[in-house]
Amino acid sequence: MSKLAKVCAVFLPIGFVFSVVGGIIMSISESPDFDGSTDYEVAYTTMTYDDEYNEECDDGSAITYSSNEADSIVLNCKAATINLFKCEKYLVNTDELDSNDLSVTNSDGTLNVNYSKEAIEDTDGDPLSIGIPKSCKNITIKCNAGDITIDEFMGNTIEISVDCGNIEISNSTVSDSCVINNTLGNAYFYGSDITGLNADMVSGNISIYSTMLSGSNKLNVDVGNAYLTFKGYPSDYTINANVKVGEIECDYDLSENTYSDDKIDISILAGNCSIDFYNEYNE
């Protein structure tokens, strides 16, 4: 059985499956219009890391580690609404967490956070807010269910695997690789510079706005739409887009540039794809 068949059998009622595949209709959550327009305003700038920290960095009820105790964080959870934000230290906010289900350890420079509590019906799981310092260079998240937000991260790698939930990465710089595996849910990237994005979406939309992709990048969607506004110009990228059932909307001749080292392969089984570019002429 293919992974698309599996997710349809597990997550989606039969009637909804036919409406999605037959009409290429995605209603998992709010998305931009097909023309790629969004409500987001992101400055066309190079990312820098300043020392202004989120107010959530207040120790309060939190487990903390100094910034020099680890350079990586690994997060495993059954269900939680996860928020990773910039902080001067590693901080796990415990205000709304069940301490019996929470484990935080530091091993060989890796902070391991495990939260085993199941989600209550009609909820997204407990809020799991984690502060990460600029010394943190690698983020790994594995979660059964829940939304994941990463803001103002500057490091080497991000690896996220989620069965059901949305993923949002904003105002971040990833220098080596960013791997996203999402079975049911959407993925959003805003105002970021990412090298080596590999996004595999089974059922959900992928939205990219004012984000520079460098190196080799792959965007795979089984059922869903791709709303793509890359930072820069068409000449900055070599783009190969393939849609089996659906439409590709782009005002530029993508075949003109085949020499850029920054390559983007887009593959959609059933869905639409819009491609645009964000630069000083249209900011």
Residue ranges and their predicted role:
Residues 25-116, 123, 127-140, 147-161, ...:
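Short linear S-[DN]-x-LW-Φ motif typified by the pepsin-like aspartic protease active-site region
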Residues 1-6:
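Positively charged n-region of N-terminal signal peptides that target proteins for export
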Residues 7-10, 45, 248:
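Short amphipathic alpha-helical "recognition" segments used for binding
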